[in-house]
Amino acid sequence: MRVPFNDKVWAGRSDDGEAGDTRRVFNQVTPFGSAVRVQHDAPVIVGFSSDEGVRRNQGRIGAAHAPMELRRVLAGLPAKTAMVALADAGDVVCDDGDLEAAQAELADVVSEVLAGGGRPLVLGGGHEVAWGTYSGLRLHQQREAENEATLLISRKLLIINFDAHFDLRQKRPANSGTPFDQIALDCAERGVPFNYACFGISDLSNTASLFAHAERLGVHYVFDVDMQETQLPQRLNELQKLLDAADDVYLTIDLDVLPAATAPGVSAPAALGVPLSVIEAMVLRVRASGKLRVADIAEYNPTLDQDRRTARVAARLAYRLL
């Protein structure tokens, strides 16, 4: 089910009377519709209100409430002077257990945003959001291309996932742990490379079977212990090489990649995790590449959060992607 733009969630304090630019993000938000074209590469928020994939994956539900809560926190951040406007395309809601239909609807919305000149930033929801986001990018490519095969083969898509988990489970029906296996199968069917890089992998959160599957698929991965602050220069160089070899980038951030003290509001908190400063620096590098086409932020669970700490972290990362 699609829920339209809600301007009431975009609200915050007013500093009228103070000198200088006192605007906040909520002052920059406008509604997005399929008939609307935005400034080229302008960010467009899309909500994916779903935790059905988390439920199927035996996780702790609550992430369906995340999109609205993240908007509330994002609304109060300082306006970005370089950003003319921020559009909001509303939410796709999965409230009937039909995850597959919700993912297909999300794909339609993502495709609409791309067709309108925008750059979708999808706020999940569980990490099942990834299949919907990716499908929307592929759908847009299909609709735009006169020759789909030529377009898909000639343009190299890099998928970057900041995550403690591979999310390469092969069990069906699909859930929050299967999206990148679904993507790998889709790439194989299309005859295009599966270029998947996963940063922040925990050796204690993935079975030997998952590591073996990742090896078979040629996944580029880095352990969480190798993504601490002293190793940031090395990781940035590694990331830059991946970016240089790509034409388009899909970035997905699972908040459980962060330490539990930083992001307590997730279904599976990390015992070690990757420092926020490292994730943020790498996100900024991706953003600066000029190749980012779509992005999403997944697994925020407001019902498990403490003092909105995780919400503030997620909003900070979203802000860097605007």
UniProtKB/Swiss-Prot annotation:
Source species: Paraburkholderia xenovorans (strain LB400)
Xref: HAMAP family: Formimidoylglutam
Protein name in the entry: Formimidoylglutamase
GO biological process, one term: putrescine biosynthetic process from arginine, via agmatine
Gene3D superfamilies per record: Ureohydrolase domain (3.40.800.10)
Organism ancestry: Bacteria, Pseudomonadati, Pseudomonadota, Betaproteobacteria, Burkholderiales
The protein's required cofactors: Mn(2+)
Pfam family, any one: Arginase
NCBIfam families given in the database record: hutG
Record field: catalytic activity: N-formimidoyl-L-glutamate + H2O = formamide + L-glutamate
Top class in the EC scheme: hydrolase
PANTHER family: ARGINASE/AGMATINASE (PTHR11358), FORMIMIDOYLGLUTAMASE (PTHR11358:SF35)
Binding site for Mn(2+) 2: D163, H165, D254, D256
The keyword Nucleotidyltransferase is assigned to this record: no
Family under the similarity heading: Belongs to the arginase family.
InterPro entries: HutG, Ureohydrolase, Ureohydrolase_dom_sf, Ureohydrolase_Mn_BS
Pathway(s) where this gene product acts: Amino-acid degradation; L-histidine degradation into L-glutamate; L-glutamate from N-formimidoyl-L-glutamate (hydrolase route): step 1/1
Residues annotated as binding Mn(2+) 1: H127, D163, D167, D254
EC number(s) on file: 3.5.3.8
